[in-house]
Amino acid sequence: MNPKLNRLAAAAKLAAAMSAGAFLLSACNNDDEPEPNTLPANITQQGMTSYPAAAPAAGNTAATQDLLTAGLGRTGLGLATAPAYADPLNPTALELRRNGIYANYRALVDPTISGGYGSLYGPNVDVAGTASSSEGLVPGREYVATLDDGSGNKRVVMAVQIPDSFNTAAPCLVLGPSSGSRGVYGAIGSASEWGLKRGCAVALTDAGKGVGLYDLSDDTVNRIDGTRATRAAAGGLNFFAANITDAARTAYNALFPNRLALKQVHSQLNPEKDWGNDTLAAARYALFALNDRYGSVDVPAPFNAGNTLVIAGSVSNGGAAVLRAAEQDSSGLIDGVVASEPVAEMPTAASAAQGW
């Protein structure tokens, strides 16, 4: 039997009990020339950062952060007060990552002890469901990239998290498009929590959502890393700016001062239509990142859709994204789907009945 099929049962367990089995790495390339590791089309890599922290700290530097908790650990994520910025008017990119993970993790799970945090679930609860005194940090590397549609106006953000515990002999990848209108870390408490603990890489994406606040009054934007800058200074790192000329913006400000535009609402790109394809793009970029991390001169691209288990799992709008990704997957990227409370549009002729 195809070894990938053995792991499809694990995808079903993910929905019910969040546990998975093992998987065989196979595939030999008989070609004389090894297959190169090529960055997928329309994707721009923004960088790779190592987050090696194994114990809680302030989380204001890369060295004091990890992939899952941004250096805060179980205790820090459970605190009712968010970590403070050294300069609240000028937060750093690393402070924004830390606080973004803090906010997004707590947004999807009950962070209170009485609700089960730290005993039933949380960074310190292992894959068998056993709670420990561990703070649950997961050191590793994070690759960040953006996806464009060729127009230069689309900015889908992707973050591929590769834990140091990644098992190259049983490679697995979890796709985590964000829920709601959240940014790239929107699935940190669901997809990342499950995948990273099991030594899987996790491909997070905002799927074209996220705030991306553009201030029309001073022409300032968010960069990809969350910091603020003028549109001109941000350049290609501009997260979103309204498609408007300076003359039109000046005229608009005179009539309607102090207005803001948001990426998901005002991009005029209807990002929802691309949720599935954006999720698939994140999967392709994740395979590139894994090959960049573990490839060699002799074997530049050891991982592909044929030998890597890929589970697409998310919640709400993210649940809709993984369903659409599975529907649109024409190349066999996805092996299993876990969609919790997905946004789904039923056919107009469909009906539902209640009863036994």
Protein language model regions, located:
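Bacterial N-terminal signal peptides that target proteins for export
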Residues: N2-A15
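C-terminal motif of bacterial Sec signal peptides marking the signal peptidase cleavage site
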Residues: L24-A27
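Hydrophobic or amphipathic alpha-helical targeting/insertion segments
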Residues: D31-E35, P177-V184, I188-F240
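Catalytic-loop region of hydrolases
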Residues: E33-C172, G176, S181-S192, K197-A201, ...
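Alpha/beta-hydrolase active-site loop
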Residues: A232-A233, N238-P257, K263-P300
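Extended charged low-complexity segments that act as oligomerization/scaffolding linkers
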Residues: F256-L260, P302-V310, M346-W356
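Gly/Ala-rich beta-loop-alpha elbow adjacent to hydrolase catalytic centers
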Residues: A312-V322
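A short, hydrophobic beta-strand element of the alpha/beta-hydrolase
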Residues: V338-S340
